[in-house]
């Protein structure tokens, strides 16, 4: 996976993402993060990238020119990398099919972080994780000139119904969530498959040593060594937690027949309490 972030604050991206799991994944060559400074593509001698909004109003608007030139630079960089990769593949695998090469010419997705976008969720992360390149555009001030957005953006995405200073923090949230789904990024690949929000359920409670803490004991089933019972308990706890905290997720939850019956019993119990 190659991330390309068009931003006014490239150091913010590099410093934050060069640590922990993401940093180790970059060291392994599993992903790259290129933060491109939009100011570098300003034609103003002071590297200015914003201007007053037509029609008046508070604040400033990011001008279309520097953003579009940054986009062109990123596209050329991606094309160059693909050409180099294609040449390497041709040397190693002469029989590569024409259809595979055509797929590689598809333009990468350009994601603009905005409160007006679709709310980011796990299934969206899974979809984005299938891409070879993802381009992110970070807005600032009162936003970006609509004309350049119309030209380059493929996906409008939000991380929630609130306002942040810029797009950098949402981009880092997205890159973290997406990267966890790339094979090899997590030390235990099963972690990405079975952690919170898998099957549209919240994660079950976790426990570690000591066995007793502040007079609270680890549930006996987790000490039993009976893997089938442990798995059943965990699924039931996930259903209980989801019903309590995020009931809307249950509409698309993947449940077995017995789990659906368990959920129905929980709901009946909740209804009886409210009578």
UniProtKB/Swiss-Prot annotation:
Gene (name only): trmD
Molecular function as annotated in GO: tRNA (guanine(37)-N1)-methyltransferase activity
Subunit: Homodimer.
GO cellular component, as recorded: cytosol
Primary enzyme class: transferase
Keywords for the protein's UniProt record, in alphabetical order: Cytoplasm, Methyltransferase, S-adenosyl-L-methionine, Transferase, tRNA processing
Residues that bind S-adenosyl-L-methionine: 139, 159-164
Main location: cytoplasm
Xref: InterPro entries: Alpha/beta_knot_MTases, tRNA_m1G_MeTrfase_C_sf, tRNA_m1G_MeTrfase_TrmD, tRNA_m1G_MTases_N, tRNA_MeTrfase_TRMD/TRM10
Cited function: Specifically methylates guanosine-37 in various tRNAs.
Domain of life: Bacteria
Family designation: Belongs to the RNA methyltransferase TrmD family.
Protein name according to UniProt: tRNA (guanine-N(1)-)-methyltransferase
E.C. numbers: 2.1.1.228
Compartment(s) of residence: Cytoplasm
Reaction(s) catalysed (UniProt annotation): guanosine(37) in tRNA + S-adenosyl-L-methionine = N(1)-methylguanosine(37) in tRNA + S-adenosyl-L-homocysteine + H(+)
Biological processes per GO annotation: tRNA N1-guanine methylation
